[in-house]
A protein has these predicted regions:
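Accessory carbohydrate-binding/adhesion or oligomerization-edge regions at the termini
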Residues: 1-26, 45, 102-105, 124
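Short, intrinsically disordered, low-complexity segments enriched in Ser/Thr and Pro
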Residues: 15-22, 29, 146-156
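Accessory beta-strand-rich segments of carbohydrate-active enzymes
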Residues: 30-31, 35-134, 141
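Surface beta-strand/loop "capping" patches
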Residues: 129-156
């Protein structure tokens, strides 16, 4: 099952306030290993987006997830224990933006309790756009020096 398969369900749900990191599976300890889906929504405000690089970084989401920003797919991640980041610069605008994360837990996948959902921190990163200078426009000067019978180069 892909998180994208559950996108239509997200608009018909009632959401409760939670704190991230969050493990939705631990709330039902009678059935810890059932296949399930978690939906996370958040609104946030940005300014100066035209001059910014904006990314969202997840330290961990278990198990398979997809992320939408302003109803557009930002990306999918299939590896539950690793950190990942999506460039969302083209998806955000000045003012209120929304994010939706759908995470799918499928059993069996591990020999121990793995949890489910956004189990680590999430960071929204906004920084000034970088300007890339083509290599042919970069000039440098260097001189080689001897130091303890080894050669090294110093670039000025």
């Amino acid at each position: 099952m892909s998180p994208v398969d559950f996108l239509q369900d997200s608009s018909q749900l009632s959401y409760e306030s939670i704190q991230v990191p969050h493990d939705w599976m631990i709330t039902d300890t009678l059935d810890l290993y059932k296949n399930s889906v978690g939906f996370y929504k958040k609104d946030f405000i940005l300014q100066n987006t035209a001059d910014s690089h904006v990314a969202i970084r997840f330290e961990g989401v278990y198990m398979n997830c997809a992320v939408w920003v302003n109803n557009k797919l930002a990306g999918e991640w299939k590896y539950g224990y690793s950190t990942f980041e999506f460039d969302i610069s083209s998806l955000v605008h000045d003012g209120t933006n929304s994010i939706l994360v759908i995470a799918v837990y499928q059993n069996p996948n591990t020999r121990w309790y793995s949890g489910a959902g956004i189990f680590r921190d999430v960071n929204l990163i906004q920084k000034q756009k970088m300007i890339q200078i083509p290599e042919k426009e970069i000039r440098y000067a260097g001189k080689c020096i001897k130091h303890r019978r080894k050669k090294s180069c110093r670039v000025k």
